Regions:
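C-terminal alpha-helix plus adjacent terminal tail
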Residues: 1-14, 61, 173, 177-178, ...
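Conserved CoA-thioester-binding segment of acyl-CoA-metabolizing enzymes
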Residues: 1-57
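Hydrophobic/aromatic residues within transmembrane alpha-helices
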Residues: 20, 56, 69, 122-124, ...
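Charged catalytic carboxylate motif
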Residues: 33-37, 92, 99, 199, ...
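Catalytic-core regions built around general acid/base machinery
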Residues: 41-44, 92-104
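Acidic-histidine catalytic/liganding microenvironments
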Residues: 48, 103-104, 244
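Glycine- (often His-adjacent) and acidic-residue-rich active-site loop
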Residues: 58-95, 115, 146
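Crotonase-fold acyl-CoA enzyme core
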Residues: 98-212
Length: 278
């Protein structure tokens, strides 16, 4: 199979496993370029029988996918180019998660750094996720921007963890470390950082080596529930909050205070809380 060139992704194939390294500096925000590349790659390999497992990782050890590009506040129609391909009722961010879930290959995230907002939703959408103890962190910090998760997070989290824990994650808006993420069900396992690569390589290659049809059968019978009504509720609530002046003020203030920079993203939750308190 010919491997296209992507501006934000580097792809390597080995033993039926496609390893996708995300590289969208400075902090891997989920912007139009990154979403375009991920969608194009998933479409490219969807019907490729030689690709049996997809492992997503980051070229930056500090950040997996920081979150959705906050400059969306200035370009609210930036993602409209994806509208023609969207299933009824889904926004582009929800549609990306559903595209991942519908992928015939097993999808795995190897999480070494931070994933917030849309990045954390990406982690919740894949089939499996494994996180490095002491390095990985997850957060749905949207509440600190005056909104709620709008890319499927409310629905995926309520499947992966209890109702109360999902509310805690969304409304508490705190950075969750790898061990607590494992306990809550956000990731499959938390592993020592020096063991993560070998473990993910082993499980990915073992799955890729299974007899033909086994993976497809397992994914079919262990399929997630129909979340279409939940997505509609989520989008309506998210869009309503996003349009309010309070959200615009917090998002713009966050950008001015250093969000989407390496320094500002280290403790984004506190940066946003300080804005709310001012």
């Amino acid at each position: 199979m010919t491997i296209p060139t992507y501006s934000t992704l580097h792809i390597e194939y080995d033993q039926g496993v496609a390893t996708v390294s995300i590289n969208n500096p400075p902090v891997n925000v989920l912007d139009v370029a990154l979403m375009s590349d991920i969608r194009a790659f998933l479409t490219q390999v969807r019907d490729d029988p030689q690709t049996r497992v997809i492992v997503f990782q980051s070229a930056d050890p500090e950040f997996f996918i920081a979150h959705v590009d906050m400059t969306l506040i200035d370009e609210p129609n930036a993602f409209d180019q994806f509208a023609k391909d969207l299933p009824n009722g889904l926004n582009p961010f929800q549609a990306l998660g559903e595209m991942i879930q519908a992928q015939p290959q097993v999808t795995i995230v190897k999480l070494e750094g931070l994933a917030r907002g849309g990045g954390a939703e990406f982690v919740a959408a894949v089939d499996m996720a494994f996180a490095a103890i002491g390095r990985a962190g997850l957060a749905q910090c949207e509440a600190l921007m005056g909104i709620i998760p709008g890319g499927g997070g409310t629905q995926y989290l309520s499947q992966r963890m209890t109702w109360g824990r999902a509310l805690e994650v969304i409304l508490g808006a705190e950075l969750i470390d790898a061990l607590l993420a494992e306990r809550y069900g956000w990731v499959n396992r938390a592993l020592p950082a020096n063991e993560l690569d070998a473990f993910v390589h082993r499980i990915a290659t073992n799955i890729a080596a299974l007899p033909e049809g086994v993976t497809a059968a397992a994914k079919k019978v262990i399929s997630p529930a129909d979340l279409s009504e939940g997505f509609l509720r989520e989008h309506k609530a998210w869009a309503g909050l996003f349009a309010r002046p309070a959200a615009e003020k917090l998002i713009r203030g966050g950008l001015q205070a250093g969000a989407q920079t390496k320094v500002g993203e280290q403790d984004l939750e506190q940066l946003l809380r300080d804005l709310s308190a001012s």
